[in-house]
Swiss-Prot record:
Belongs to the bacterial ribosomal protein bS18 family. The keyword Flavoprotein does not apply. This is Small ribosomal subunit protein bS18. One of its GO terms (molecular function) is small ribosomal subunit rRNA binding. PROSITE patterns: RIBOSOMAL_S18. Keywords: Ribonucleoprotein, Ribosomal protein, RNA-binding, rRNA-binding. Part of the 30S ribosomal subunit. Forms a tight heterodimer with protein bS6. Disulfide bonds: none annotated. The keyword Signal does not apply. NCBIfam families: S18. One of its GO terms (biological process) is translation. It holds the Pfam family Ribosomal_S18.
Length: 75
């Protein structure tokens, strides 16, 4: 009996669908969607972001943390 492999659903980049060219560090509501409960950045294989937008999100989160808009840790 042969088993059929289940194909993984390819996640699409939400930021590409929204046609965003720039991820603003002041948009904390958008950036908080890419953080875990503890405040860590969620990897792109879980969020479905493309490489370009994942880098932009990473830089924006780090800038927002430096400015004090996002916490480093959520306790």
């Amino acid at each position: 009996m042969a088993y059929k492999r289940k194909r993984k659903k390819v996640k699409k980049c939400r930021l590409c669908e929204m046609e965003l060219d720039y991820v603003d560090y002041k948009d904390t509501r958008l950036l908080s969607e890419f953080l875990t409960d503890k405040g860590k950045i969620i990897p792109k294989r879980l969020t479905g972001n493309c490489s370009k937008h994942q880098r932009m999100v990473k830089v924006a989160i780090k800038r927002a943390r430096q400015m004090g808009l996002l916490p480093y840790l959520k306790i």
